[in-house]
Amino acid sequence: MGNLAQEKVLQSIKTLREKKARIYLFAQDTKGNAKASVKYIYDVASTLKKGGFNPIILHEKNDYAGVESWLGNEYMNEIPHQSIEGQNLEISPEDFLILPEIFGYVMDQVKTLPCAKIVLTQSYAYLLETLQPGQTWAQF
């Protein structure tokens, strides 16, 4: 292994050990309506943050309504948020992307990202519903 590659691997290991890797959690915009599945994602992000990790809530649009109206401002202020609309995400091999199963259609768009991808299954009923015809989770 060349020196540059070895340095990159060592830097990635250091980033993981120091809990600096970004953990992107994709959340849908409920437009201010309470939804248990979204609260769960925020609870996971909050727990990760309190454990010293680096969670970031990802959402689709810049006009994300957030959860302040039904969860209070603690979640909106405590956890960083980032829109994927018109922006380039900085994704590294040591990062994680957590997608709820309702965003199965997004997996095809992110399959080439260098990070680990995790499907958060909150309802098995949606597990296959959002995949394109002929696709399986094993492809991702």
Regions found by a protein language model. Name each.
Residues 9, 64-140:
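Extended catalytic core of nucleotide-activated donor transferases of GT-like folds
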Residues 1-96:
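N-terminal pre-catalytic "stem/leader" segment of glycosyltransferase-like enzymes
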